[in-house]
Amino acid sequence: MKAFLGALEFQENEYEELKELYESLKTKQKPHTLFISCVDSRVVPNLITGTKPGELYVICNMGNVNPPKTSYKESLSTIASIEYAIAHVGVQNLIICGHSDCGACGSVHLIHDETTKAKTPYIANWIQFLEPVKEELKNHPQFSNHFAKRSWLTERLNARLQLNNLLSYDFIQEKASKNELKIFGWHYIIETGRIYNYNFESHFFEPIGETIKQRKSHENF
């Protein structure tokens, strides 16, 4: 089994290369960023951010969903983990990372009949959190039946929805308003490796390099 062989390789070689780092993490962690992404196997947070163990606090679920405050009881695990990262671990940044070819977002365009819901009731219940995206798409000026364009738009609207959902929580809004927590929305394109960041002022997703240039010009980034 590949996972077992990989674990052995890690123990005998890769661990040794970062032994001092792992030893320093024995009794503490101080990640700088809370990274919320999809469970998709093609999205590897530490790989796409170039970070080492101890730098990211990662939460993954189907569709990188953050239920709004009005529905928090339906996803206690997610919001409890977010609260822990912010209130106790003290992360300084929060990134919502959507991605291309997202199955959860793609399901927005499918007809969910009762038979399908009966076969996978837990998935059907979770996907309901994406209903606002479906409604927004109906009259969106950029909506297209072209599969790739439609997928990207859906994924980006979902990332924006999840950002808004996060800000419905007082403890997150308070940290953000004091500039103690910086919040970002990403759209990662699997086949090209490109990452786009949501611009809260223009309401568009821009190449991540543009975001870095803008922030470097007026703050320590």
Swiss-Prot record:
Enzyme Commission numbers on file: 4.2.1.1
Pfam families, per database record: Pro_CA
Gene3D superfamilies linked: Carbonic anhydrase (3.40.1050.10)
Entry's cofactor comment: Binds 1 zinc ion per subunit.
Record family assignment: Belongs to the beta-class carbonic anhydrase family.
Name of this chain's protein: Carbonic anhydrase
Binding, Zn(2+): C38, D40, H99, C102
Native source species: Helicobacter pylori (strain ATCC 700392 / 26695)
GO annotation terms (biological process): carbon utilization
Top-level taxon: Bacteria
Entries under PANTHER family matching the protein: CARBONIC ANHYDRASE
Organism lineage: Bacteria, Pseudomonadati, Campylobacterota, Epsilonproteobacteria, Campylobacterales
InterPro entries: Beta_CA_cladeB, Carbonic_anhydrase, Carbonic_anhydrase_CS, Carbonic_anhydrase_sf
Keyword Zinc: yes
Cofactor(s), by name: Zn(2+)
Keywords carried by this UniProt record: Lyase, Metal-binding, Zinc
Catalysed reaction equations from the record: hydrogencarbonate + H(+) = CO2 + H2O
Gene Ontology molecular functions: carbonate dehydratase activity; zinc ion binding
